[in-house]
Structures are given as structure tokens and as C-alpha cells.
């Protein structure tokens, strides 16, 4: 039964390293990996491609149901995301896509449409689920729960370095403002607001290296 499959949820705001840590932990454990944020970004991209009005909830919900999302691992180990059979990985990573996804994610009907799809990732031997409400809404019965945090300034700095490496010119101050605005949207939305589960392990990654965070998370599962 699916509910007997172990699940590790790693929640937290943007830029705390959820994705990086989750992928490493999933690989070490040999478990499946769910990037829930990619699903919302995929819906955002599909909505943009088909000119869906984000204020039209009915159209957005239909888009969420109709959008086909597949994760394909390349020979180099990198995960590519296909949206309706089109490789949209690079588009999904754009800041504008993230902002649109955050707006869409605040709509309860869209979250409901994607809930079952996320739960279907729960397969043997186990699942590492990365998101904002994995431990509180999607997998409230998960055996292991982590909530990652980090100061907004540090998260902006990390994102700035990532974008600079890719040759994307951006202002650090603008990134910081965007992160704070997204935090406010995520924490204040009426449906599935961003918050740690009562039984989650809290980890502040502000002054930590990735391997240190990974070690703490793995210890939760293996000890």
C-alpha cells in the first residue's frame, strides 16, 4: 500500500537549498524525488503558452488538469522537465516563471487539482518530496519531515551567484525584494500557507554548507 511507503518531506521558502539537498538525499537513499515546485511552474508555463488569463480560475484549473508533466534524467544525470512533451527546463527556472507560479499556487482550486498528482509519486522504496506544503498538506503522515530556513539576504546572494554563473544579469537588491515578496505571499495565503509541520525538524541553512545540511537530513532518516 502506498501509505506504507516511507516519505521524507523537505519544505521551506525559495532559495534555502531544498532542491539541491533533496536531490542529493534522494540519490543517497535510492528513493524517488518529487520537485513539487516544478509542477506549479509547469502549469505557469503551460498557462503562458496558451494565453490563459491567470485571473480566470476555471481556465487555470483546466490547465492544471490538462498539462502533462514528465521528468526525464539525461545521461549526465541532470533532470529535464517536459511540459506537454516540450523541454521547458530552462523556462521553468526563469524568475518570471517563479513569480507566476507563486501567484497560481495561491489559488486553492489549482492546489487541489495538483494534490493527487503529487501523491502519486509515493512509490517504493521511498520518496523525498521537496516543496512548501509537503509535510503539512500533501504528505501529513510522512515519517520524516524537515523544514529548511535561511535569512532572506543569504538566499538572495545564493540566487544572485547562480544567475551570474549562467550569464544572467540581475540586481541583487531586486532579487532580495522579490524573495521577500514571495515569502509574504507564501506565508499569508489562505490555502496551505508556508509553515513548518508541527513534527518537522527545523534547519537554518544560513551559515551551513550543503553537505552539512545533507548530513543532518540523512541522520534523521537513518539513525
Curated annotation (Swiss-Prot):
Keyword line: ATP-binding, Cytoplasm, Kinase, Nucleotide-binding, Transferase
Lineage of the organism: Bacteria, Pseudomonadati, Pseudomonadota, Gammaproteobacteria, Lysobacterales
Protein name: Cytidylate kinase
Enzymatic reactions: CMP + ATP = CDP + ADP; dCMP + ATP = dCDP + ADP
Membership in a protein family: Belongs to the cytidylate kinase family. Type 1 subfamily.
GO BP terms, alphabetized: pyrimidine nucleotide metabolic process
Organism: Xylella fastidiosa (strain 9a5c)
Pfam families per the UniProt record, alphabetical: Cytidylate_kin
Domain of life: Bacteria
Cell compartment(s), UniProt: Cytoplasm
Gene Ontology molecular-function annotations: ATP binding; CMP kinase activity; dCMP kinase activity
Gene Ontology CC annotations of this record: cytoplasm
Principal cellular location given in the protein's record: cytoplasm
Amino acid at each position: 500500500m502506498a501509505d506504507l511507503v516511507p516519505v521524507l518531506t523537505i519544505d521551506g521558502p525559495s532559495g534555502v537549498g531544498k532542491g539541491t539537498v533533496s536531490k542529493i538525499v534522494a540519490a543517497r537513499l535510492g528513493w524517488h524525488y518529487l520537485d513539487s515546485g516544478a509542477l506549479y511552474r509547469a502549469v505557469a508555463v503551460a498557462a503562458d503558452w496558451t494565453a490563459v488569463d491567470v485571473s480566470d480560475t476555471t481556465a487555470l484549473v483546466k490547465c492544471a488538469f490538462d498539462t502533462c508533466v514528465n521528468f526525464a534524467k539525461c545521461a549526465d544525470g541532470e533532470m529535464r522537465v517536459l511540459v506537454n512533451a516540450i523541454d521547458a527546463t530552462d523556462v521553468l527556472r526563469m524568475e518570471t516563471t517563479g513569480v507566476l507560479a507563486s501567484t497560481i499556487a495561491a489559488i486553492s482550486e489549482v492546489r487541489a487539482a495538483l494534490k493527487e498528482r503529487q501523491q502519486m509519486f509515493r512509490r517504493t522504496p521511498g520518496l523525498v518530496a521537496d516543496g512548501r506544503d509537503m509535510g503539512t498538506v500533501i504528505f501529513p503522515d510522512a515519517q520524516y519531515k524537515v523544514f529548511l530556513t535561511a535569512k532572506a539576504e543569504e538566499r538572495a546572494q545564493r540566487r544572485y551567484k547562480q544567475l551570474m554563473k549562467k550569464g544572467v544579469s540581475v540586481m541583487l537588491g531586486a532579487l532580495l525584494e522579490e524573495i521577500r515578496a514571495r515569502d509574504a505571499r507564501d506565508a499569508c495565503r489562505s490555502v496551505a500557507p508556508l509553515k513548518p509541520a508541527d513534527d518537522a525538524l527545523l534547519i537554518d541553512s544560513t551559515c551551513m554548507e550543503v553537505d552539512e545540511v545533507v548530513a543532518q537530513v540523512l541522520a534523521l532518516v537513518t539513525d
